[in-house]
Amino acid sequence: MEKFVTHTGVGVPLRVSNVDTDQIIPARYLKSVKRTGFADGLFSNWRSDENFILNQEPFKEGSVLFAGPDFGTGSSREHAVWALAEYGFKAVFSSRFADIFRGNSGKAGLLTGLMEQEDIELIWKQLESGETETTVDLEARTVTVGGNSYTFEIDDYTRWRLMEGLDDIGLTLRNEGDIEAFESTRPGFKPRVVAS
């Protein structure tokens, strides 16, 4: 997983609330457990509409999504996070997220920041007026759009994991020496994991 400290890209105003994981990526795209091959399925039911925001310049190159409240609700679908990340999104901001979606995002390297709805609405207006350059500073917990800075919330543990670039495997590998030392002292008759 890549470290996330700061990111500058195009902000995308998604003026939709109650976006569930089936809207993010419909079930017909969930035929793989690999983390790739899902970008085409992202918002596919909406992308058939030529007026959908991701079909518009410069938003089709967006990497920071500002969504309405209740983003990522519905089933626990890691594919939704993978689709957003593979499309190019590095961060998603909303005034409310589904807890499971938010947890899946942090583990996969996608920043999900909580913001006041009033700030989201101000950002939507800025983005729609052409001020699309957006900088996310995870260390400072700020988003800057068109010279205006806004704060966002993220729990300390997820923030640390993102800044260190640690997924679950990376966390385990940080303790590889301790694990090997423990395994070397286990009696031979006890079960052990054997490398393939």
UniProtKB/Swiss-Prot annotation:
InterPro entries per the UniProt record, alphabetical: 3-IsopropMal_deHydase_ssu, Aconitase/3IPM_dehydase_swvl, AconitaseA/IPMdHydase_ssu_swvl, IPMI_Swivel, LeuD
Gene Ontology MF: a single term: 3-isopropylmalate dehydratase activity
SUPFAM superfamilies: LeuD/IlvD-like (SSF52016)
Reactions listed under catalytic activity: (2R,3S)-3-isopropylmalate = (2S)-2-isopropylmalate
The keyword Metal-binding appears for this protein: no
EC number: 4.2.1.33
Enzyme class, UniProt record, top EC level: lyase
Keywords for the protein's UniProt record, in alphabetical order: Amino-acid biosynthesis, Branched-chain amino acid biosynthesis, Leucine biosynthesis, Lyase
Function comment: Catalyzes the isomerization between 2-isopropylmalate and 3-isopropylmalate, via the formation of 2-isopropylmaleate.
Protein family: Belongs to the LeuD family. LeuD type 1 subfamily.
HAMAP family: LeuD_type1
Quaternary structure annotation from Swiss-Prot or TrEMBL: Heterodimer of LeuC and LeuD.
NCBIfam families per the UniProt record, alphabetical: leuD (TIGR00171), PRK01641.1 (NF002458)
Protein name, entry field: 3-isopropylmalate dehydratase small subunit
Origin species: Corynebacterium aurimucosum (strain ATCC 700975 / DSM 44827 / CIP 107346 / CN-1) (Corynebacterium nigricans)
Lineage per the UniProt record: Bacteria, Bacillati, Actinomycetota, Actinomycetes, Mycobacteriales
